[in-house]
Amino acid sequence: MTEECGEIVFWTLRKKFVASSDEMPEHSSQVMYYSLAIGHHVGVIDCLNVAFRCPLTEYEDWLALVEEEQARRKMLGVMTFGEIVIDASHTALLTRAFAPLADDATSVWQARSIQFIHLLDEIVQEPAIYLMARKIA
């Protein structure tokens, strides 16, 4: 992966696969599917694709417009910790917080906010999907 310096990169989970070269018996595969369903990753590899990139200064400017403090704090976690995960437990809060920016036709952040809300909607539709944001210095 080649990332430019000074940006936040958002990846989204698009598929998972089992890392195994052995043929799995049917009864064993049912155990594996059950394990996945309850959240255990038994040799499963997540395949992430870049959803969008945002220069650091633009990211900070974008988040400065988010009025919901808890949502802003969640999103700024990437600046503090270098990485955040956004999953189904965050979608309602973040969608509410970014909706005013997505609805503001005069905002330079409208397109990015709409794109972000679409990614959140994908998580609502398929809770196994998640976003990962990472600060690339």
Curated annotation (Swiss-Prot):
EC primary class: oxidoreductase
InterPro entries to which the protein is assigned, alphabetical: Formate_DH_maturation_HycH
Keywords in alphabetical order: Oxidoreductase
Coiled-coil region(s): none
EC number: 1.-.-.-
Recorded GO MF terms: oxidoreductase activity
Homology family: To E.coli HycH.
Biological role stated in the UniProt entry: Possible component of hydrogenase 4.
Name of this protein: Hydrogenase-4 component J
Organism placement in taxonomy: Bacteria, Pseudomonadati, Pseudomonadota, Gammaproteobacteria, Enterobacterales
UniProt gene name: hyfJ
